[in-house]
Regions:
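Short beta-strand-to-loop acidic/aromatic patch adjacent to the donor-nucleotide binding site
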Residues: 80-91
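A conserved acidic beta->alpha catalytic loop
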Residues: 38-46, 91
Length: 155
């Protein structure tokens, strides 16, 4: 079975963080490695993450960048076969979201996968449209042959 790592960059995750952690703890497939990379939060983000079993690496806020911080996390999990990136405000829509995301990698032709992002209930019309347009309800498998049709959205 593939070893799965989860990486969540955080900064002052606030009131929603404990709800996120509670919802995550009910997932049917638990990742083997749980890593929060925190950008020096001044609230209880770090202590809550640790209470829910996450390893926490704290970095200076000035060192955060989206790609580099995530790569730093990947480097911290050398034994993970699959890496899942989540954000501190992305609530998983179902209790089997991780399980379903990981299952696609049973097909050795699959190199990357992502879950559907739904708009928050408070999202404005533009944000809601962007999520619904970019993340349709149907599962899709794409290959490099689809590049002419989908461009950057091929992967």
């Amino acid at each position: 079975m593939n070893k799965v790592g989860l990486i969540v960059p955080t900064l002052n995750a606030g009131r929603m963080w404990e709800s996120w952690l509670k919802a995550f703890s009910r997932q049917t497939r638990k990742p083997d490695y749980l890593l929060v990379i925190d950008s020096s939060s001044s609230d209880n983000t770090v202590s809550l993450a640790r209470a829910y079993g996450f390893d926490v690496q704290v970095i200076p806020k000035s060192e955060f960048n989206h790609g580099g911080t995530r790569q730093y996390g990947v480097n911290q999990l050398p034994n993970a076969d699959i890496i899942i990136f989540l954000t501190q405000d992305a609530l998983l829509a179902s209790f089997d979201a991780i399980e379903r995301l990981v299952a696609v990698f049973e097909d050795e032709q699959i190199g990357a996968a992502y879950g559907r992002q739904l708009p928050h209930t408070s999202a404005g019309p533009i944000a809601a449209h962007a999520r619904l347009f970019n993340y349709p309800a149907e599962s899709q498998i794409r290959s490099l042959e689809d590049k002419a049709r989908y461009g950057i959205k091929t992967v």
